Regions:
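Substrate-binding/catalytic cleft of secreted carbohydrate-active enzymes
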Residues: 1-182, 190, 195
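Histidine-centered active-site microenvironments of extracellular/periplasmic hydrolases
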Residues: 186
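Surface beta-strand/loop "capping" patches
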Residues: 193-205
Length: 205
């Protein structure tokens, strides 16, 4: 959206979306933009983000606004979110903080919108297997990877919540803990014992 006309069109469409969906009970946060591919520091893009926030709060002040979900680059947001598929637990832990070169962090809830993406490969899925965070054929090694990532989140001291990628396989991605038709892939009690760990408390203001 470095294009002025495209930005104005998006704002008009966004108003229609807000008015159509603001009473829908499943919507918990407004997130109009995701990881940007354009120049986020341009004046046109920055103005678009601020206009989206102003419109959203005017039409529905009851919900949080997340300006650039998952990007870690924020202008004006109620929720600070990042997405990372870093597989190494040590490097993953280091990424769980606001980047000092980005917008000033103002103690918003810090959310990991996406992480994990680990593929469980079987002979049946080998020809059609893809994911974000590496491929495993050894179940114990896969559980170890997941648990190390969860431990890093738990000990971060800043994370308010997280979303693992992902609940179930989809057409092109085989990194779910359930299959496409919602059948468990693993010992779900073992999965539960990892994911039930309580995230760390957010930083106090």
């Amino acid at each position: 959206p470095d294009d002025e006309v495209a930005s104005r069109n998006l704002l008009s469409e966004w108003i229609e979306i807000l008015e159509r969906d603001r009473n829908h009970p499943s919507i918990i946060t407004w997130a109009p933009l995701t990881v940007p591919l354009s120049n986020v520091t341009s004046g046109t893009f920055a103005r678009l983000v601020f206009d989206l926030q102003k419109l959203t709060k005017a039409i529905d002040p009851s919900r949080p606004f997340n300006d650039l979900t998952g990007s870690g680059f924020h202008f004006l947001t109620d929720i600070w979110s990042i997405s990372t598929y870093e597989p190494d637990a040590t490097r993953f832990a280091l990424s769980l903080k606001p980047d000092k070169n980005q917008a000033a962090y103002a103690n918003q809830p810090f959310i990991i919108g996406e992480f994990g993406g680990i593929v469980w490969e079987t002979s049946r899925t080998k020809e059609d297997t893809w994911g974000h965070g590496g491929t495993f054929t050894n179940e114990d090694a896969l559980f170890e990877r997941i648990e190390k990532l969860i431990n890093a989140i738990q000990s971060s001291g800043i994370i308010s919540g997280f979303c693992y990628t992902q609940f179930s396989d989809i057409e092109q991605e085989k990194n779910g803990i359930y299959t496409y038709d919602r059948q468990p892939k693993f010992d779900m009690e073992r999965i539960r014992s990892i994911f039930k760990k309580i995230p760390s408390k957010p930083i106090k203001k």
